[in-house]
Structure formats: C-alpha cells, structure tokens
C-alpha cells in the first residue's frame, strides 16, 4: 500500500500482478470460488465461455488483491475477498462495491471511494486500485482507464524487450 499526503492525489494505492494460469487449479474448486468471489461475480463468470471465464476470474482476483492492499490488509487478513465485489459501470468499467468488513475497513481509514483498473496482456493481468476521501479534491488530470491500460502495455513491452522477450513473474514483480 502506498499513501500520499496533502493534495498530491488519492491517498491509498494497491497493485496486483499475476499470470492468469496461477489460478487454474484453485478456480475449479467450489470452496475457492465461494471464498474469493461474490455471488454476482460467480453468476457472471458462469455465463462466460471457459477461456473468457478464466481471464475474468483472474482479473477479478487481481482487482480484489489490489483493493485489499489499498485498504491496508492482505488477502485472508480479516477482510473476506468476497466482500470486495468488482462489478461494472454502465460503460463497462470495473466498479468496486464493499460490504461487511471491507466497508468497515474503508470507513475506519477514511476512504469514501475506491476505483480499480484491470488490464490483461497475453497471460498477465494487472489491477491497480486507488482509494480516496470525498474531503480530498479530485485531480483534474486523473488518468482514464484507457490511459492506465496504455501505460501498462508500454511498460510491459519495454520490460519484455529488455528481458529478451521472456518475462518471468519474479522479474515482472521486480521491474521498475
């Protein structure tokens, strides 16, 4: 979690990066889906073709991890992941809805709003969550979902080229 101060922007940020295949074995297990995903997320996943479902569940998992990091807690550390619901706005962008312990944690640290961006590239998914208080002024130069995705794609392309076309998880996590 990163926290800024003053008017420099939203104060809480969480990021998660993973390979889509990391969840394959677990995502097939009913207990894991119940533990990680909200009922609306499970319903939506059930309507998708298998390859799209795999990508969807990985994206939602990364988004939940990013939101939990922005809340200052880890996965399975007092805030059930299923209480972080990643829905969609009318435009199709990810929409964060918190319930239960997740909503209480946000209130405890003064967060009124949390936004998340999810990007997929080949077998990687990244999610960035940003939380802020309504008392903080919104910045006029806040990046759009598309701008964040384009920036991620540019960093990933540079990192992949620098590694000779091979990007491992360990290297991805340590790349600047």
Language-model region placement:
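Core catalytic alpha/beta fold that binds nucleotide/phospho-ligands
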Residues: 1-176
């Amino acid at each position: 979690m990163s926290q800024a101060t003053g008017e420099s922007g939203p104060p809480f940020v969480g990021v998660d990066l993973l390979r889509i295949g990391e969840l394959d074995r677990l995502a097939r297990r009913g207990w894991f889906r119940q533990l990680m995903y909200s009922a609306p997320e499970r319903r939506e996943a059930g309507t998708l073709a298998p390859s799209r479902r795999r990508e969807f569940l990985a994206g939602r998992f990364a988004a939940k991890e990013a939101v939990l990091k922005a809340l200052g807690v880890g996965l399975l550390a007092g805030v059930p992941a299923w209480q972080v619901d990643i829905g969609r706005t009318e435009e199709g962008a990810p929409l964060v809805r918190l319930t239960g312990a997740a909503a209480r944690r946000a209130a405890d640290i003064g967060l009124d709003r949390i936004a998340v961006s999810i990007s997929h590239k080949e077998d990687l998914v990244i999610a960035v969550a940003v939380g802020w208080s309504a008392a903080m002024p919104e910045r006029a130069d806040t990046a759009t979902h598309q701008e964040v995705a384009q920036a991620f794609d540019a960093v990933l392309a540079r990192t992949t080229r620098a590694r000779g076309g091979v990007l491992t998880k360990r290297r991805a996590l340590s790349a600047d």
